[in-house]
């Protein structure tokens, strides 16, 4: 959606507090950005 979850975008926050990204990216907790796995 161009807002979160894709590469170099912020991690998406779920209602339960988890930070997630779209496949295949992973959330880097130290920067809260989505990067390569």
Curated annotation (Swiss-Prot):
Presence of the UniProt keyword Disulfide bond in the record: yes
Keywords annotated in UniProt: Disulfide bond, Ion channel impairing toxin, Neurotoxin, Potassium channel impairing toxin, Secreted, Toxin, Voltage-gated potassium channel impairing toxin, Voltage-gated sodium channel impairing toxin
Location(s), subcellular: Secreted
Tissue: Expressed by the venom duct.
A GO-annotated cellular component: extracellular region
Cystine pairings recorded for this chain: 4-12, 11-27, 21-34
Keyword Secreted recorded: yes
GO molecular function, one term: sodium channel regulator activity
Chief location category: secreted
Extra remark beyond the main annotation: Exists in two forms, due to cis-trans isomerization at 23-Asp-Pro-24.
Domain notes: The cysteine framework is XXXII (C-CC-C-C-C).
Role summary: This toxin reduces the outward currents that are due to the opening of voltage-gated potassium channels in DRG neurons. In addition, leftward shift in the presence of this toxin is observed in averaged normalized conductance-voltage plot of outward sodium currents (Nav1.2/SCN2A).
Name of protein: Delta/kappa-conotoxin Mo3964
Organism this protein belongs to: Conus monile
Upper classification of the organism: Eukaryota, Metazoa, Spiralia, Lophotrochozoa, Mollusca
């Amino acid at each position: 959606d161009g807002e979160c979850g894709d590469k170099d975008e912020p991690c998406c926050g779920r209602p339960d507090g988890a930070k997630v990204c779209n496949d295949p990216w992973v959330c880097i907790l130290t920067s809260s950005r989505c990067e390569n796995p």
